[in-house]
Regions:
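Helix-breaking motifs and short loop linkers at transmembrane-helix boundaries and internal kinks
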Residues: 74, 90-91, 114, 122-123, ...
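Residue-level signature of mid-helix packing/kink "hotspots" within the transmembrane helices
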Residues: 76, 105-113, 163, 197-198, ...
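Conserved MFS/SLC helix-loop-helix module at the cytosolic interface between two early adjacent transmembrane helices
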Residues: 109-149
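Intracellular terminal tails of multi-pass secondary transporters
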Residues: 1-70, 94, 238-273, 455-521
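C-terminal ends and interior cores of transmembrane alpha-helices
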Residues: 133-146, 362-376, 390
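Helix-to-loop junctions at the C-terminal end of transmembrane segments
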Residues: 110-123, 338-352
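Glycine-rich segments within core transmembrane alpha-helices of 12-TM secondary carriers
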Residues: 183-216, 224-230, 417-445
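Extracytoplasmic gate region of multi-pass secondary transporters
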Residues: 79, 278-343, 400-401, 428-429, ...
Length: 521
């Protein structure tokens, strides 16, 4: 990593002039670069700035939130179908249901690279819309999968098609919002997991009121409802969601320039269609990527438990099917509240991202310890602890914002995201690193659940405790690393030149090539 820093210091970045009339490397492939140059002399009033931000919040944010909510409900639809005899209908035995739950993440693994390449090469909203339509079809096909092997195949392809969504939305959040705005907005659209859980619980509650001998069967209705809604939503994304501020039809030309100038201040650029081999090496050598990979993998194991087996764990505490769906929605509400509180703190308290994540991780660790060591007779104590582990989403969201706010260079961000989120391929750095850890952690999660351990589920609760403890340690190390780099750069180069750093970001330089870049803690 030191040699990367040395080359960065030799390169330097010239301060941005009022007009740039010479060729700069990477500008032809950098989305929004021409608008950035045009906007350099733009005089923007506070009123215009606020109006553009509100337009983005009222247009972009709801689409992100609904897309992520549908993905979550579709991915965890087995959790609800299982309440209505899905295992019995397919004749599942032993760990068959565990493999079926995990198979979607194996699909993520193989789908991440092609989806990441497509998002970088073509309009992101087109790729995401097609992905949404295809995974919606897979959800509908679950009703026609009358054998274990066919259901496994459908779940695998569902994972492939879903692989574009979370990394795509994470990258696109950085296209639209400033570094200060990203955490709260990311927390808002990621709170869709909680909203999706609540909606899914009440859909299940409604289905539970229907006759048990009806046709189609009640578990089939779950897939019909969720799959149909997803297919319809794909058309909304295709026709309404823009790829980047520079081509947003709901903005005027001047508003597009303002939107591009806003995110130029992130020092990370918007999007670059060219693949950078140099950024691949940087991505794999980046200590941030490594720490995020470990933390997300560790936390994804308990996440796989909660997503796939929450209804079973709550039901085996002694509650009816209807009561189980109601109680599960409380945990989803905890997730929403934790994300909004965490995002608000980060927005208003400078350099509080990782400290906020640490507080949430500590709460999860304590809650997991209570689940592991409280006696089975203490039903409500264990249930409240199970609700509280949903606050782990704060730490995961901070991991995503670390990529969108603290990693420059489009290929670099993409690789890190893939490695951390669902796992993707070895060529697109940061985002894909995170997605890789997320994928395999969630794949492993269902296998720490053993039905014979009900109602205490010792293996699952110990898995929760260990996973959250590792995540807590990684976030503390990440905080120490970025703080040290900021301080050493200030000593070596003096105060950062903000204009030069903005220019470097729009040219798709990484944070290691841009000596004026400072991490947001």
């Amino acid at each position: 990593m030191a040699d990367v820093e040395r080359r960065a210091s030799d390169t330097g970045v010239a301060p941005a002039a009022s007009k740039i009339e010479f060729e700069l490397p990477g500008q032809d492939n950098a989305v929004g670069y021409r608008e950035y140059v045009e906007a350099l002399d733009l005089d923007i009033s506070d009123r215009e700035y606020t109006r553009v931000r509100w337009k983005l919040d009222l247009t972009i944010l709801p689409m992100f939130l609904i897309t992520q909510a549908l993905q979550f409900m579709d991915k965890t639809s087995l959790n609800y179908a299982n309440l209505f005899g899905y295992q019995e209908a397919l004749g599942l035995q032993g760990r068959d249901f565990n493999y079926l739950s995990a198979m979607v993440y194996a699909g993520y693994f193989f789908g991440q690279y092609p989806c990441g390449w497509l998002i970088g090469r073509f309009p992101a909203q087109r790729v995401i819309a097609i992905s949404i339509l295809l995974w919606g079809v897979m959800v509908l096909l679950m009703t026609q999968s009358q054998s274990y092997s066919s259901a496994l195949a459908v779940r695998f392809f569902m994972g492939i098609f879903e692989a574009a969504v979370t990394p795509g939305l994470t990258l696109m959040t950085g296209f639209w919002y400033t570094r200060r705005e990203i955490p709260l907005r990311q927390c808002i659209w990621y709170s869709s997991l909680g909203w999706g859980g609540i909606i899914g619980s009440y859909i299940s509650m409604g289905v539970s009121k229907l006759p048990e001998d009806m046709t189609p069967e009640r578990w089939e209705l779950i897939f019909y409802i969720l799959g149909g809604a997803t297919c319809l939503w794909a058309f909304v994304i295709w026709f309404v969601l823009p790829d980047a501020p520079s081509n947003a039809r709901f903005l005027t030309h001047r508003e597009r320039l303002i939107a591009v100038k806003r995110v130029a201040g992130n020092e990370t650029g918007i999007k670059n269609k060219a693949f950078s081999k140099d950024q691949v090496r940087v991505g794999f050598m980046d200590p941030k990527t490594i720490l995020l990979f470990i933390s997300v993998f560790a936390a994804a194991i308990p996440n796989g438990v909660v997503n796939s087996f929450s209804t079973i764990i709550i039901r085996d505490m002694g509650f009816t099917t209807t009561k189980t769906t109601q109680l599960k929605s409380v945990g989803d509400a905890v997730q929403i509240v934790a994300l909004i509180i965490g995002g608000t703190i980060i927005l208003n308290v400078p350099n509080s991202r990782l400290l906020t994540a640490t507080a949430a991780n500590l709460l999860c660790t304590i809650a997991a310890a209570c689940m592991a060591y409280l006696p089975s007779s203490n039903t409500w104590g264990r249930l409240i602890s199970f609700w509280l582990v949903n606050s782990q989403s704060v730490g995961f969201t901070v991991s995503l914002t670390t990529i969108s706010s603290n990693m420059a260079g489009y290929t670099h961000r993409s690789l890190a995201s893939a490695m951390v989120l669902y796992v993707t391929h070895l060529f697109l750095p940061a985002l894909f690193t995170v997605l890789t850890a997320y994928c395999w952690g969630n794949f492993a999660g269902p296998f720490v659940v053993n039905q014979s351990e009900a109602p205490h589920f010792t293996g699952a609760t110990i898995g929760l405790l260990v996973g959250y403890a590792i995540k807590l340690g990684c976030h503390l190390l990440l905080l120490a690393y970025m703080f040290t780099i900021n301080r050493s750069r200030d000593k070596l180069y003096g105060p950062a030149n903000k204009e030069a750093s903005d220019e470097a970001g729009m040219r798709d330089l990484t944070e290691f090539e841009n000596r004026d870049f400072r991490y947001v803690l």
